[in-house]
Structure formats: structure tokens, C-alpha cells
Amino acid sequence: MPKVGMREIRRAQLIDATLRSIDEAGLPGTTLASVAQRANISTGIVSHYFGDKDGLLEATMRHVLRDLWSATTRRRTAARKDPRSRLRAIVAANFDDTQIAAPVMKTWLAFWSQSMHDPMLKRLQHVNTRRLHSNLCAEFAKALPRAKAREAASGLAALIDGLWLRGALAGGPIDTRAALKLAHDYIDLLLASD
């Protein structure tokens, strides 16, 4: 009989091993066997929990997305209630330590690439995109007319993605201070234009 709570412990262990495998070998080099090796368990156990490599990547991305959503909620809750502060909190969540660690950044890049070919991953990406846009739009709408708020949300979402992507591809740690400053300046510009 399995130990109580072991399933979640084992899944977390395997997701961590998947992140490390993608970091070290890329998505093509990540297999059920490479994940099992990093987790010091049998390939059969990985298969038991996730089925196949696609199931493993989906579970890993769900974990990364939960971390992003948790960071967003935590930072928005802690921010002052004005739109500028809450927008800055949303931006900061996208550059949270849970999102800029090398294994996570490489997993995001692999996920984006795979989401163009896998319907489930595409759906996850679509949900993430809509959630970011909705959160940004809700805050901009407190200070801007609805149409302008939607446009501002699209622009800021593109800036967040672009800053994050450039940072991820730079080959070293993301300069979060510089990225946040650019995003904050953009927010200030948009809110001042009204």
C-alpha cells in the first residue's frame, strides 16, 4: 500500500528532475529515462505518473504556471491598490525568482516551441496569455477608457514577453532591475497619457 502523500512528493520530485533535464540537455535530450536517472528512480515510475514525455512536459508546465500565478496573486495582494502599483506587481511576478531560474527559463522556451504542435500545451499557453492580458486590462481600465486599456494591456504584455525573452536568450542571469525599469517607464507613460 502506498504511503499517504507519496504521490504528490513523487510528482514534485519528477517535475524537479524534468526541469533539471531540460536545463542540462534541452527538450530533445529529455526522456523518461533521463528524468528517472536524475530522480534516482525507475523509468516505469515516471511512466506510471505521467504516461509519456508529453504528459511530463504538460505537468511540468502546469507547475511553472502555478508558480507564476501564485507570484502574481501574492505580489498584487501586497501592492497598494492603485493601478500603477498593481501593474508593476504583475510585471514583477513575471520576473519572479520562480520564473527566471535557468531551468525554468529553458523549460518556458521549450514549452513555447512545443505549444505550436501540441494541442494541450497550446491550450495552456492560450490560458496563460489570456490571464496576463485580463489582469493587465483590469488594472489599466481603472485609469483609462476601455479601448485604450485593452490596447495598453496588449502593449505591456508584449513588452513583458519581449524583455523576458531577450533576458532568457542573453546567456546569463536576467537583469531584472533593467527589465522592470523599462516596464515601469512604459506603465508611467501610458498612465500619464490619459
Swiss-Prot record:
Sequence ranges assigned to domain HTH tetR-type in this UniProt record: 8-68
**Keyword annotations of the record:** DNA-binding, Repressor, Transcription, Transcription regulation
Q: In which pathway does it act?
A: Amine and polyamine biosynthesis; betaine biosynthesis via choline pathway [regulation]
Q: Name one GO molecular function term.
A: transcription cis-regulatory region binding
Q: Name one GO biological process term.
A: glycine betaine biosynthetic process from choline
Note the SS bond partners.
none
Q: Which InterPro entries match?
A: BetI_C, DNA-bd_HTH_TetR-type_CS, Homeodomain-like_sf, HTH-type_TetR-like_transc_reg, HTH_TetR, Tet_transcr_reg_TetR-rel_C_sf, Tscrpt_rep_BetI
Q: Which residues bind DNA?
A: 31-50
Q: Tell me, what's a Pfam family for it? A: TetR_N
Role this protein plays = Repressor involved in the biosynthesis of the osmoprotectant glycine betaine. It represses transcription of the choline transporter BetT and the genes of BetAB involved in the synthesis of glycine betaine.
Q: What is this protein called?
A: HTH-type transcriptional regulator BetI
Species of the source: Burkholderia multivorans (strain ATCC 17616 / 249)
Its lineage reads: Bacteria, Pseudomonadati, Pseudomonadota, Betaproteobacteria, Burkholderiales
Which gene name belongs to this protein? betI
